[in-house]
Amino acid sequence: LRRCARVPARPELKWPNRRAHAAPLPARTFMDSEKLAELVADACDDRKATDIRLIRVDEVSSLADWMVIAGGQSDVQVRAIARSVEDRLETEADVLPLRKEGLNEGRWALLDYGDVIVHVLMPDERGYYDLEAFWSHGESRTFLPSV
């Protein structure tokens, strides 16, 4: 059996999958998690979400810093709210969700942005799962849109 020759190291490549002659990436400005949560709530409000709640969970959980919980009256509205959040955060904060769930069914959409987790639920699901009560030990506030 012949052994494959080892590929010599290329010192001009400092990072995997990045060529030495590639232009440096622009510096990203990171938005803090509270501002990101407020941007999410504002995007939910753009699509007429009901009872938008922001819950600070960073002191009680390592899962995220903020939970944003919003209501939609139909599966179409739940999907529209979730799309509004995705579009707004991509354009204004330059972030994409790490994971998305429930967009096809439209009864409970979940968008995970790492520091901020977004739940958009229909009234039956919101009442049944009662996420506000589950996270009641975190600081909670209702989103009030600016006029």
Give the positions of each predicted feature.
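P-loop NTPase catalytic core of nucleic-acid-dependent motor ATPases
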Residues: S62
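Long, contiguous binding/interaction regions
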Residues: R10-E59, Q73-A80, D87, E101-L103, ...
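Active-site phosphate-binding and catalytic loops of NTP-dependent enzymes
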Residues: T91-K100
